[in-house]
A protein has these predicted regions:
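N-terminal, well-ordered alpha-helical segments
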Residues: 40-47, 86, 90
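Glycine-rich phosphate-binding loop and adjoining helix at the ATP-binding site
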Residues: 58, 68-97
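Short beta-strand segments
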Residues: 6, 60-64
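Short glycine/proline-enriched coil/turn segments at helix->beta-strand junctions
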Residues: 19-20, 51-56, 94-97
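Short coil-to-beta-strand
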Residues: 17-18, 59-61
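Feature marks short, surface-exposed loop/turn motifs that line or immediately flank catalytic pockets
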Residues: 11, 65-69
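Short glycine-rich, Thr/Ser-proximal phosphate-binding strand/loop in the N-terminal lobe
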Residues: 2-40, 44, 73-74
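Phosphate/pyrophosphate-binding loops at sites that engage ATP/ADP/AMP, CoA/4′-phosphopantetheine
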Residues: 42-59
Length: 97
């Protein structure tokens, strides 16, 4: 079982997948236009789902743009200026330790 997030320009969609790949939960919320708020929302949703399921789960996040291997920053994120030049991956790893 795992939790996945799809961060877009207008929404954050969360899903819980069973080990078989079967979807057991899906929810869509508005995406805030501020980096720290996006991180906070994902952490909050994850905690809510883990409490509901009574277990800690792996979390995956996809978002527009690419990670620069040289800098670790996000670049080329169309319509998502609030995550441009941010260290999304490093920040998430700190939140989920």
């Amino acid at each position: 079982m795992q939790i996945g997030f799809d961060v877009g320009a207008t929404k954050i969609e969360s899903v819980v997948l069973e080990d078989t790949g079967q979807e057991s939960f899906r929810e869509r919320t508005d995406c805030p236009k501020e980096y720290d708020s996006i991180i906070s929302n994902i952490v909050e949703i994850t905690k809510k789902l883990e409490t509901k399921l009574n277990k800690s789960l792996p979390v995956g996040v996809c978002h527009p743009g690419v990670h620069s291997p040289q800098t670790g920053l996000i670049k080329n994120a169309p319509n998502c200026y609030w995550i441009e030049k941010k260290t999304f991956s490093k920040r998430f790893k700190r939140c989920f330790r």
